[in-house]
Amino acid sequence: MNDIENLDRPPAIFIMGPTASGKTALSIALRQRLPVELVSVDSALIYRGMDIGTAKPSAQELALAPHRLIDIRDPAESYSAADFRKDALKEMADITAAGRIPLLVGGTMLYFKALLDGLSPLPSADPQVRQRIEQQASELGWGALHQQLAVIDPVAAARIHPNDPQRLSRALEVFFISGKTLTELTKISGETLPYRVHQFAIAPASRELLHQRIELRFHQMLDAGFEAEARVLFDRGDLHTDLPAIRCVGYRQMWSYLSGEIDYNDMVYRGVCATRQLAKRQMTWLRGWSSVQWLDSDKPGEALDSVIQVVSA
């Protein structure tokens, strides 16, 4: 696409970053200064009844700056990158039609990638293949299947945790159905985003600062009633750790605690560690992201001015 074609496209803003980096605060500040409407790009915030453990914007924050694509699914329901792309494109079109600018904010980098580059031509799920994989897992364990994936598709295996059965199963399923690896197929892009996108990433200047923010926020969540929130979900009886909602960082560790598998202190330790690992994965995505302008979490005024300056140019 040449520059003239790009200028003809309506503007959009991406505010990306690791967990606990200040994305929400920056986006709300931008809502006060620019003609923007916010769209959440977060695979955890889509779930109803999961407010504290996902650091969902508060009622006061949502009153200041409403977010679209929050609270759109029950925790028992699934939601894919394809679902997100379809929903986000509709919200963006509605915002643009109203003469305003879509501002997409969140940390689910797979969603941002699906929106920006389109979706790869992955095969549909095959229940028989999936059942065969799950049978193998029950006999050999997911660790053995992860080793199998490491031989077939080492890039995907390095990215997928051995304790993530959904993503591990999907990577193997794609190979067994198509004969091509997930890594090969995801290099083939689909329809690109029909917007002129200003892309920003916000993060603290050092990993140590980010780790401190993550630990502080996890304790703030506990003080705010995270355990009680998780217990309501636990007591429903229809939710389990194979569901994406319950595998969300923090909830998975809380589930182990509520099940009696680990004690409270271990839950806190594991929850903080898992959140740091999530932030590390998010930062890895972002460091390989092209056309992104970095902002410093610890200089919110400068970050705000930088975005306004670029978007208003």
From Swiss-Prot:
Subunit structure as annotated in this protein's UniProt entry: Monomer.
InterPro entries, A to Z: Dimethylallyltransferase, IPT, P-loop_NTPase
Functional summary from the UniProt entry: Catalyzes the transfer of a dimethylallyl group onto the adenine at position 37 in tRNAs that read codons beginning with uridine, leading to the formation of N6-(dimethylallyl)adenosine (i(6)A).
Keywords: ATP-binding, Magnesium, Nucleotide-binding, Transferase, tRNA processing
Positions that bind ATP: 17-24
Region of interest: Interaction with substrate tRNA: 42-45, 166-170, 247-252
Residues where substrate binds: 19-24
Entry's family note: Belongs to the IPP transferase family.
Catalysed reactions, as listed in the record: adenosine(37) in tRNA + dimethylallyl diphosphate = N(6)-dimethylallyladenosine(37) in tRNA + diphosphate
Gene that this polypeptide is encoded by: miaA
Originating species: Yersinia pestis
EC number(s) on file: 2.5.1.75
Site residues by UniProt (Interaction with substrate tRNA): 108, 130
Protein name: tRNA dimethylallyltransferase
Gene Ontology terms describing biological process: tRNA modification
Gene Ontology molecular function: any one: tRNA dimethylallyltransferase activity
Pfam families from the UniProt entry: IPPT
Cofactor: Mg(2+)
Domain of life according to the entry: Bacteria
